[in-house]
Each structure stands twice: as structure tokens, then as C-alpha cells.
């Protein structure tokens, strides 16, 4: 088990002890390991970005409950061109994304585009700026808790609940507006 296990845990402060009875230490006790993540999503974003040059020193953290959906997001920007979004529903990795990722992207794009328009940053551009442009260098971890998740596909790795789009959109928009 790698040290990545606990960092991936979305529940900050949880401590996990593992004992492997198949492998013994020199004193005859089972090999054991302890995993602890104090920082939860923020720590995970820092871990994902540890080899990249940060544009923002500390990740932005969002925690809200909207439409009875608890939403947690940690995000940061780095100097790469790639977007790296990791998402979870009820602690299940939804590596194909889904409605919670759609809500996040929609809110981020709308808020940043509105800010750029109002500040005049886009006036001299001869091209239309898209959501992909705002997500270059973005690292984000999204975690939602959904009472009755509806997963799409056989692998159940994509959230299909349409109401979650609005919940995540609203939570992310509200906090992003504070930065504009």
C-alpha cells in the first residue's frame, strides 16, 4: 500500500492503521503501517501538484451544502497546460466525471469569463476565450455526498444526477465571486 492512500482520503483528520499478517517484522510482529491526512482535499491537491510550479501558493478551498448536497472542492493553478480534475461521490472515485464535474467547470468558466469581461482583459483578443482556456494548469479535487447517486455505465464511474450540477455550480460560483 502506497502513502498515496491516505492523502486521497477526503475526510481530513482520519487515521488508518494497517497490519499485514502475511509479512512479519524481525521481532515477529506483523508488518504495520499508519496513514494520516490532516489536510484532506487541500493536502491532496498539494500532493498532485508537488512537481509543478504553482501560480497560487495555497489551494482555494470550497465547502458548502447546496440543495442538500455537501460539496467540497480544493483547487489550484500551476504553470502546466494540462487540466487535472479528480472527482468523488460518496468517497467513490468517479474518474469519468459526471454531473458534479460539469457543475464545477460551468461555474468556474462563467465566473472567470465574467470577471475577465468586466475588467477589460479580453477586449484586445481577436479570439473567443473558452472554458478550456480557463482550465489550463488547473488541478482540482471535487467531492460530493449524494443521498441517492445515479451512476452511468457498467463501471459506475460517472455521476448522472442532474440536480448535482446546480448544487456544485452554486457552491463554486459563490466562492469564486469572492476572488473576483
Stretch-by-stretch model annotation:
Residues 143, 179-180:
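An exposure/low-complexity boundary signal
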Residues 162-178:
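Flexible helix-coil linker/hinge segments at domain or subdomain boundaries
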Residues 13-154:
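GHKL/Histidine-kinase-like ATPase module
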Residues 2-6, 179:
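Short, small-residue-biased leader/transition segments that mark boundaries at the very start
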Residues 149-166:
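Short, low-complexity, polybasic intrinsically disordered segments
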Residues 4, 96, 100-103, 164, ...:
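Short amphipathic alpha-helical segments
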